[in-house]
């Protein structure tokens, strides 16, 4: 039951966006439209040489792969790189509130969005989008991009496995309601996320309790 509630929170966020701003694909409310590259700074990263163990052993800089970009806030990562790797590769350390977009990857990965909650680098399969704060709110923009998932995937180019690239990402059309309205939306989303986190914690607590009781009864 509680896991179903998590989906309800996601649906609520989407419904709130549609209610306040309309469909990003239709822009029936006639908001001003600009290219993503005109309202943000967009970069990417790289994969430090895997053969050099000094680039990964005891790494301290979070390094995000496209498979970890899955329409959720990013608080932690699977791998870390060292300062030496950062200095000797095309990796860039991006600040919290950078929006990440998976440009290619297996299955449904391409086009998915993540909002960095930590300072982190990325590999070359991820676009890092830093919104111009005077124009667009990062929470509004991340939700906008998530709702354009199918449209963005269809913009990909290539043969057997179509990919996005930075030029395509920069060309994505974004509508821009007044910043005050974007920020009001962001405040409501933050409240939804707080409530969602509470439900997630209660699920984790319940699973921990059940595991301990199973261990008690069967060992």
What residues fall within each predicted segment?
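Sequence-specific dsDNA recognition surfaces
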Residues: 37-52, 67-96, 122
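Short coil/turn segments at secondary-structure boundaries
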Residues: 29-32, 49-56, 156-158
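Short proline/glycine-enriched turn/loop segments at secondary-structure junctions
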Residues: 53-54, 116-117, 132, 160-164, ...
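Non-catalytic DNA-recognition/assembly elements of restriction-modification systems
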Residues: 4, 8-46, 171-183, 190-219
